[in-house]
């Protein structure tokens, strides 16, 4: 497969030029205007942020993309699907309230917001996975599959189960209905290292399934209740909660890539990722830790695989921030350094598996040419 082109611009802004101006210029250079949008529904998939989290993308960025679509005669809407776990985005009403509280509405974004899998997270379509190895079909939010054109607008950051969250995670996990998310997560569940557990109860507070109790001041997981979402792993400050089988994370990664294939196959797609506020964990948390790496810039491509690879490569070249989770890990005596910021931030992850599987099934290529836009 030939190299894909990924376009990049940094966050440096001379007087009179804003980040929003640069984002618009980036999208145009990357070819968004080559898509025929006249009279067509355009799904712009993004994450509206959990209440309390401040690392999610600002709605101003979404408006740039929505306005570009409208300029081309498109009918854009912002979308995301409900979460597997309880929180502020587990059903459409609370999800819309959360989006509004985090600044997403028709005024700030220039378009409507539609929750992709409906009121209860059950409005889904079973979509074939072309070349699927682990998933023959995927359960995707109905509204997302109803769109004629699909655009992903992703916040690239760390993730406690997948290493990082970028375009493929935003598409694959994010577009899955609640049942679709369960299908992806079903392969792996965390364990407790009782020698390290301090009984602080942070994992229990983070668990949305009421699956963690305490016996003799040590956490205990009820696997009949556990959904395998991994939020408890990110909640623990002492690395007491871990995935006992790294292959489970790898299977999650590969399923996620196949779900992304189901979403993108057979229609025009365009992908944008902003590498900023690079927190160590997912924006699904009701908080965000300090960034582990400095802000890098904005990337865009028709190829989500090349896009994620380019973003990952840029992060791996960056210098870790000392006063951060990653900085603290690297400063620990005896810490096993992987020379990989994602693995040093969240051990027992296999982030390359997502890209490998996506390339294997024909979603895109990891080989890319980077073109810089000023």
Q: Where are these predicted regions, by residue range?
A:
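Terminal amphipathic helices with adjacent charged low-complexity linkers/tails
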Residues: 66-67
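Extended, low-polarity segments enriched in aliphatic/aromatic residues
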Residues: 2-61, 71-80, 85-374
């Amino acid at each position: 497969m030939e190299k894909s082109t990924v376009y990049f611009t940094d966050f440096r802004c001379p007087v009179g030029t804003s980040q929003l101006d640069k984002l618009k210029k980036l999208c145009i250079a990357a070819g968004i205007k080559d898509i025929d949008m006249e009279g067509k529904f355009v799904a712009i998939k993004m994450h509206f942020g959990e209440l309390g989290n401040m690392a999610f993308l600002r709605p101003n960025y979404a408006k740039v993309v929505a306005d570009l679509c409208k300029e081309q005669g498109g009918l854009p809407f912002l979308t995301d699907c409900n979460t597997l776990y309880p929180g502020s985005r587990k059903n459409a009403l609370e999800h819309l309230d959360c989006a509004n509280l985090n600044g997403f509405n028709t005024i700030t974004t220039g378009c409507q917001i539609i929750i992709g899998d409906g009121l209860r997270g059950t409005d889904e379509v079973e979509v074939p996975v072309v070349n699927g190895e682990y998933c023959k079909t995927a359960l995707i939010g109905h509204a997302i599959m109803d769109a004629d054109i699909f655009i992903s607008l992703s916040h690239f950051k760390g993730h406690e189960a997948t290493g990082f969250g970028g375009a493929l995670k935003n598409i694959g996990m994010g577009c899955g209905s609640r049942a679709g998310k369960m299908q992806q997560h079903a392969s792996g569940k965390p364990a407790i290292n009782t020698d390290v557990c301090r009984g602080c109860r942070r994992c229990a507070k983070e668990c949305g399934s009421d699956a963690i109790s305490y016996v003799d001041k040590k956490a205990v997981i009820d696997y009949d209740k556990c959904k395998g979402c991994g939020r408890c792993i990110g909640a623990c400050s002492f690395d007491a909660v871990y995935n006992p089988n790294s292959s489970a994370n790898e299977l999650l990664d590969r399923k996620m890539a196949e779900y992304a294939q189901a979403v993108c196959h057979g229609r025009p797609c365009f992908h944008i990722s902003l590498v900023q506020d690079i927190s160590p964990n997912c924006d699904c948390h009701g908080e965000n830790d300090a960034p582990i790496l400095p802000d890098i810039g904005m990337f865009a491509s028709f190829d989500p695989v090349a896009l994620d690879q380019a973003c990952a490569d840029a992060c791996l070249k960056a210098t870790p921030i000392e006063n951060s989770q990653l900085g603290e890990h690297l400063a620990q005596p005896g810490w096993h350094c992987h020379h990989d910021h994602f693995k040093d931030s969240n051990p027992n992850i296999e982030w390359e598996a997502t890209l490998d599987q996506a390339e294997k099934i024909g979603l895109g290529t990891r080989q890319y040419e980077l073109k810089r836009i000023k």
